[in-house]
């Protein structure tokens, strides 16, 4: 019997009911409502943006481009162009009404509140933001960043500095203007759930979590409990 571990999977929170929605390789995926928006891989065409229901049905091509669906909000996908340009776009979750809202050399787009955040590749990967309708960009973090994420309330940004001098994950509280390093070194995959920030070392060997309320920073070694 052959065993395949590639594809897009779903699983219940207690570790049961593992099922595969899509069998070929994929990268970025985003759950929004009862649909998953994900990068669908084709051996000839490469990565394209698709959507599917959470049961794997109604698989639909949205865009023939390797768009990363990091930010889906209010029935709108916000993304940066990939193939021919790197402008910031907005598009209905149906794939219709695609329009450019900011011209620039942008990546890692996240919509938070009334702003769209992005890394400005023309500005040494500084973190910038614009309004939902575009306009002038405002610089938020003046360091070269590798990745970042924002709390649900939009008040705190966690980011990885990648300038070769003071690399690490930092916490920027926008309400107070304070910056604090929470981990020194090189890390990836910053995810935020409630008061917890999860991240992984650059080699992918160790995962960590940081408690925003208490300031505790610990190794993350979960065990899966089954009914």
Residue ranges and their predicted role:
Residues 1-3, 37-39, 78-80, 117-119, ...:
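Residue position within the beta-strands of beta-propeller blades
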Residues 3-10, 44-51, 84-90, 123-129, ...:
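Structural motif
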Residues 4-5, 25, 32, 45, ...:
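Short loop/turn segments that connect beta-strands within the blades of beta-propeller domains
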Residues 12-16, 53-57, 92-96, 131-135, ...:
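Short loop/turn segments that connect beta-strands within beta-propeller blades
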Residues 19-23, 60-64, 99-103, 138-142, ...:
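Beta-propeller fold detector
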Residues 23-33, 64-74, 104-113, 144-154, ...:
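Repeated scaffold domains used in trafficking and secretory/extracellular systems
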Residues 71, 77-82, 86, 102, ...:
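Solenoidal tandem-repeat scaffolds enriched in leucines and small polar residues
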Residues 198-227:
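Blade-level signature of beta-propeller repeat domains, shared across WD40, Kelch, NHL, RCC1
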């Amino acid at each position: 019997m052959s065993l395949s571990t590639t594809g897009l999977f779903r699983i219940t929170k207690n570790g049961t009911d593992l099922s595969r929605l899509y069998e070929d390789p994929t990268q970025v995926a985003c759950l929004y409502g009862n649909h998953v928006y994900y990068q669908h891989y084709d051996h000839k065409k490469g990565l394209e943006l698709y959507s599917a229901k959470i049961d794997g049905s109604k698989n639909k091509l949205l865009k023939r481009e390797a768009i990363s669906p990091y930010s889906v909000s209010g029935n709108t996908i916000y993304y940066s162009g990939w193939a021919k340009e790197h402008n910031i776009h907005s598009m209905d979750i149906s794939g219709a009404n695609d329009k450019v809202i900011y011209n620039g050399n942008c990546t890692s787009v996240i919509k938070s509140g009334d702003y769209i955040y992005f890394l400005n590749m023309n500005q040494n990967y500084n973190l910038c933001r614009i309004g939902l309708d575009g306009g002038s960009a405002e610089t938020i973090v003046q360091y070269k960043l590798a990745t970042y994420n924002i709390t649900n309330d939009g008040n705190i940004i966690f980011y990885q500095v990648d300038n070769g001098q003071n690399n690490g994950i930092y916490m920027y509280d926008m309400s107070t203007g304070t910056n604090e390093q929470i981990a020194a070194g090189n890390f990836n995959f910053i995810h935020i759930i409630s008061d917890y920030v999860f991240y992984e070392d650059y080699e992918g060997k160790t995962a960590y979590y940081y408690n925003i309320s208490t300031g505790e920073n610990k190794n993350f070694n979960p065990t899966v409990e089954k009914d």
